[in-house]
Amino acid sequence: MRIADYSVTKAVLERHGFTFKKSFGQNFLTDTNILQKIVDTAEIDDQVNVIEIGPGIGALTEFLAERAAEVMAFEIDHRLVPILADTLRDFDNVTVVNEDILKVDLAQHIQNFKNPDLPIKVVANLPYYITTPILMHLIESGIPFSEFVVMMQKEVADRISAQPNTKAYGSLSIAVQYYMTAKVAFIVPRTVFVPAPNVDSAILKMVRRPVPAVAVEDENFFFKVSKASFTHRRKTLWNNLTGYFGKTEEVKDKLTKALDQAGLSPSVRGEALSLEEFASLADALKGQGL
């Protein structure tokens, strides 16, 4: 029997008198086939260390610990720590850290792996309410995670992996794809969770690029420009950029020159621009002193 078997999950929760906290976005997976598929998608073996976020009662952790060198699981809910000590008692390669992943010194924790030089993968069922902040925090942490295989709301997975000229494409797509390739591996129906969420989930596989997707003069400025370009999706690039940089004649003149230099029409919408075009635009705007 597995932790994720419905009868086991139910028994564990009852034994510990656990009640779900909506504020933590807790939904426990009760399908062992899907858990196996997640670990297979992540290609976990004994030459990999794993960071897990939100282990719950250890359903995914169990599958990870069977194959990984070590698993470090960050759980914000202190009530789950004794439950994890119970459900994962047979594993000596799991460390549970009762801290908020957004506030920990992750680089310091990683040094606590027995072999910190092994590749590190992030495998997790992320809380829906805070998926994007967690992902961006980890991606921008400077820690060279080789891969992320994470479950999230399907809509968010679609946005992250979206291509130009699609409804889902936006600044989040650019922010992630600048650092990583992103592809939806498979869909997870809402019916396999306790309690069931209101939406379906997706497993997103992201692999770190050896170097960023595009070369830019100023990364922060590149992200600001891409974000500004999607402020109002139905508006043109010109309208969004004048809304961000200002509408003085001087700004308009600089914008005109930058768009011309980047080979872009003022009437194009942000959703039509590739990462390469956003890079050209950001560098041209920077060159104009904006």
From Swiss-Prot:
Q: What is its EC number?
A: 2.1.1.182
Sorted alphabetically, which NCBIfam families does this protein's record hold? ksgA
Chief subcellular location equals cytoplasm
**Any GO MF annotation of the entry:** RNA binding
Key words, A-Z: Cytoplasm, Methyltransferase, RNA-binding, rRNA processing, S-adenosyl-L-methionine, Transferase
User: Where in the cell?
Assistant: Cytoplasm
Superkingdom as given in the UniProt entry: Bacteria
User: What is the scientific name of the source organism?
Assistant: Streptococcus pneumoniae (strain P1031)
The UniProt entry's GO CC annotations, sorted and at most eight, read:
cytosol
Official protein name in the record: Ribosomal RNA small subunit methyltransferase A
